[in-house]
């Protein structure tokens, strides 16, 4: 129901798809959810809702993304359109994938555009969306858009495995992990690559399912066990450990906080 209301202009829950550039970010995560749960989330939607999503996603081509992780927001939306059988923009997909490949700096890390930033955007965006966009191409067979061999996907997958090993080692026995960089209000979203690796059965041999499950459970229990990160109405607070509005970024809003659900 929430998916349908988000694109229904008559609903109070209709998202502001056609204003500013930020909706491209929101759309990318909606599209990512459809890619991950295509049969469970996209296929059951009624035809009108599907048409509305395709229209809103297509209209977001008005947004010119900067040469940062934003390129993957455009690419993820377009890859979903491709998977759904709608017309996709090949240039927005290919240029993003090539640019991200150029941004790999080694040992499981990508820079966020021309300059390296010590934050968790490798978790929030770069690893998951890059791998999943490459996967769409790999699974779509031969195409006339980009000669992207299967090794591109395999290489990106191995990089994410290395990054997942680093994330797992960040986690202390008490369930704490280092806090650094912007957007830290996304909390457990920092562990998205580790969760994705486990869910897809892609964990490297150095990490067992039980090991990752125990580590992530410890983090979640520490983060949410005593409800300090929820307000009186049950919504997430603006902060990392309780209500800490001062650590938020200028672009952070209450909806942003639910990036925590990525893990």
Predicted regions and their residues:
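Extended polysaccharide-engagement surfaces of secreted carbohydrate-active enzymes
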Residues: 196-263
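Glycine-rich phosphate/ribose-binding loops and adjacent secondary-structure elements
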Residues: 164
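Aromatic-lined, polymer-binding surfaces characteristic
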Residues: 1-160, 168-195
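Short, functional N-terminal and low-complexity linear motifs
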Residues: 97-98, 160-161, 225-231
């Amino acid at each position: 129901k929430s998916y349908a209301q988000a694109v229904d202009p008559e609903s109070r829950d209709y998202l502001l798809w056609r204003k500013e550039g930020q909706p491209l970010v929101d759309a990318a995560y909606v599209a990512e959810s459809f890619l991950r749960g295509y049969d469970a989330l996209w296929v059951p939607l009624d035809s009108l809702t599907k048409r509305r999503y395709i229209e809103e996603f297509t209209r977001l081509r008005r947004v010119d993304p900067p040469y940062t992780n934003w390129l993957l927001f455009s690419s993820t939306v377009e890859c979903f359109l491709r998977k759904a059988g709608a017309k996709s923009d090949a240039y927005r997909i290919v240029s993003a994938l090539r640019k991200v490949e150029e941004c790999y700096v080694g040992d499981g890390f990508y820079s966020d555009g021309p300059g390296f930033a010590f934050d968790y955007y490798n978790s929030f965006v770069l690893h998951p969306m890059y791998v999943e966009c490459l996967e769409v191409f790999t699974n779509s067979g031969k195409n006339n858009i980009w000669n992207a061999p299967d090794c591109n996907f395999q290489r990106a997958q191995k990089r994410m495995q290395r990054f997942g090993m680093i994330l797992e080692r960040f986690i202390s026995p008490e369930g704490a992990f280092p806090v650094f960089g912007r957007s830290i209000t996304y909390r457990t979203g920092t562990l998205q690559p580790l969760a994705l690796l486990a869910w897809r059965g892609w964990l490297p041999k150095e990490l067992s399912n039980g090991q990752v499950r125990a580590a992530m459970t410890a983090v979640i229990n520490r983060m949410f066990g005593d409800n300090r990160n929820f307000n009186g109405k049950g919504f997430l607070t603006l902060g990392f450990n309780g209500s800490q509005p001062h650590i938020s970024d200028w672009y952070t809003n209450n909806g942003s906080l639910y990036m925590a659900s990525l893990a």
